[in-house]
Amino acid sequence: MTKDSLDYLIKIAIDHPYSKDLLLARKEYQKYTGEIFEDDKSYEDRMALFLEWYIFERIDPSKEQTILESIISNSKEVPSSILINIKQFINNIHGLFIVKKIKDGSVRVMNLFTDKKYDIYEPSSKLYFSKDNVFEGRLLPYKESYFFTGNFCFHPDGTKKYIKSEIKKILTSQKSNEKELKFKKTTMSKEFKVLNNTTRSIKKLQEKVITINNEKEINKIKKKIDGLEPIKSIQEEKCLMLEKEITIFTDTKIHRQGKLDKILLMQKLAYMRLLFERSRNIDLKNIYKN
């Protein structure tokens, strides 16, 4: 059922109107993964990986959506049984995996970006995988399980150390951004506390005015309230600005940048794999390097 839904999704994505940017997108993709030709051994696999990127990850600048999100938004013509699966595809996991264990009909892999392990139903597990293989792949959720799309970019033995070192750079950057986000949230929490104190002070003074009959005392309290109101407005504005700043930072640095860094690394590694595929007597270490 997952494969049927994926095939249906691809069929829609490469047809009008979703295919309008296909050629432009291919140029964007090959800028990082290298230009591919029909006589390349991995041509079909790479074209399949390109289509996955086009559907699941490329943002259409005019809509600020992926092709997948656009298809879901305009889902009137999609059969309901397939639409249910396609909606789940939003939670796909694109990553660099290492094979931990191979069984008849299944494989256990670990996502090197998160260290999370997955037991995947894979009838051809012994044909596709070998223990300690490092590869790029995409997991699609279906019910309570995950399935690979079947399109992979396998990296040669001897590249694991380099790949892990590149992943570590991304994770270090992510931790730095998360630390900064935590600091921003702490700052905002303190500012809201100050605002709440000011608001409570104003409320207490307003309640006090009601209980007093002395005009002089009333005017004195009202003067205090008048002095606190502009302070409250400034504090409210500051809190709103901090909220907006945190929202933007979370979207750009935590979500988008984190995802983009991973994608760019996988594309860079795919290009290195292509160079290795075409190479003649070139040491692997001279390809998988910065």
Regions found by a protein language model. Name each.
Residues 16, 20-100:
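Accessory interdomain/linker segments of ATP-dependent helicases and helicase-like nucleic-acid enzymes
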Residues 101, 111-113:
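Acidic, low-complexity intrinsically disordered regions
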Residues 105-109:
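Short aromatic-glycine-enriched beta-strand elements
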Residues 116-121:
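A short macromolecule-binding patch
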Residues 122-138:
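Short nucleic-acid-contacting surface segments enriched for D/E, G, S/T with interspersed K/R
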Residues 138-145, 152-155:
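Short, charged beta-turn/beta-strand-edge "cap" motif at the junction between a beta-strand
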Residues 149, 164-211, 215-290:
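C-terminal effector modules of nucleic-acid-centric enzymes and ribosome-associated factors
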Residues 158-163:
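Short helix-loop boundary/capping segments
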